[in-house]
A protein has these predicted regions:
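N-terminal beta1-alpha1-beta2 submodule of the flavodoxin-like/Rossmannoid cofactor-binding fold
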Residues: 1-97, 160-173, 180-214
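Residue-level signal for beta-strand positions within conserved beta-sheet cores that form or flank
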Residues: 4, 35, 102, 137-139
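Glycine-rich NAD(P)-binding loop of Rossmann-like domains
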Residues: 5-7, 101-103, 151-157
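A broad detector of the eukaryotic-type serine/threonine protein kinase catalytic domain
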Residues: 13, 96, 106, 110-111, ...
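Short, glycine-/small-residue-rich phosphate/pyrophosphate-handling segment
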Residues: 30, 105-145, 156-163
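Mobile beta-alpha loop/short-helix "lid" or hinge segments that flank ligand
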Residues: 39-50, 97-99, 132-152, 179
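Short, charged/polar low-complexity linear motifs in solvent-exposed/disordered segments
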Residues: 120, 126, 154-155, 169-170, ...
Length: 214
């Protein structure tokens, strides 16, 4: 399965050097690129985002454009004090209103040092993303005890964790393949002015049925 022609955006909600959110996200990004799909990784540590209520910065406008043009988004967050990071919240705030996430499939990845993982962070982040109109994928990945699962170079030491994170990436690609690609192809087909789709429909069994018989 390939989703060529689409671009995804990946965001890690931590600005700490060597943070585990970025290490986990890198596995998902690698899986996406293995499938020949372009993905733009937004480094929030290098972005100068605006505080809510202030005019958008140049970086905010650039990020809005990247997200608006993306087919889907992966958000990775650490769990801080029972919720997602303020960095991710500021990222979402800088996407404007209506949000750049509106109508887009979003995959969520959470990491935490504790035994229960980032369940609370993901629950809260799901609610916010849904509130701004994102299509949040049902499956999320919560990584518990993350400090034991990655080495300093970013290599994952646990095959099961790596499989789950890569699976999140493929879930997003599968969603795009099954739901976004066919719609985009049909829209392009219709915009081209071609009438071939009408001929195909006219030759189908459904075309011969009178209205009210379905």
């Amino acid at each position: 399965m390939a989703t060529n022609g689409f671009r995804l955006v990946a965001v890690a909600g931590s600005v700490r050097s060597g943070n585990f959110s970025s290490k986990a996200l890198a596995l998902a990004v690698d899986e996406i690129r293995k499938r020949h799909v372009e993905v733009e990784v937004i480094d929030l540590a290098r972005a100068h985002l605006s505080q809510p209520g202030l005019p958008p910065s140049e970086d905010a406008l650039r990020i809005r454009k990247l997200v608006s043009e993306a087919a889907g988004v992966i958000l990775a967050t650490p769990e801080y004090h029972g919720s997602y990071s303020s960095v991710i919240k500021l990222f979402i705030e800088n996407l404007g209103f209506p949000s750049g996430l509106a109508g887009k499939p979003v995959a969520l990845l959470g990491v935490a040092a504790g035994q229960i993982g980032a369940i609370k962070a993901l629950e809260h982040l799901r609610g916010v993303c849904a509130h701004v109109g994102a299509v949040v994928l049902p499956a999320t990945v919560s990584v518990a005890g993350v400090q034991k699962l990655f080495d300093e170079s970013g290599r994952c030491l646990d095959p099961a964790t790596e499989k789950n994170i890569r699976g999140l990436a493929t879930s997003l690609l599968d969603y795009l393949h099954n739901n976004v690609c066919p719609r985009a192809a049909m829209e392009e087909f219709v915009r081209s002015g071609s009438t071939e789709w009408m001929k195909h429909w006219a030759g189908s069994p459904d075309a011969a049925r009178p209205s009210g018989t379905l």
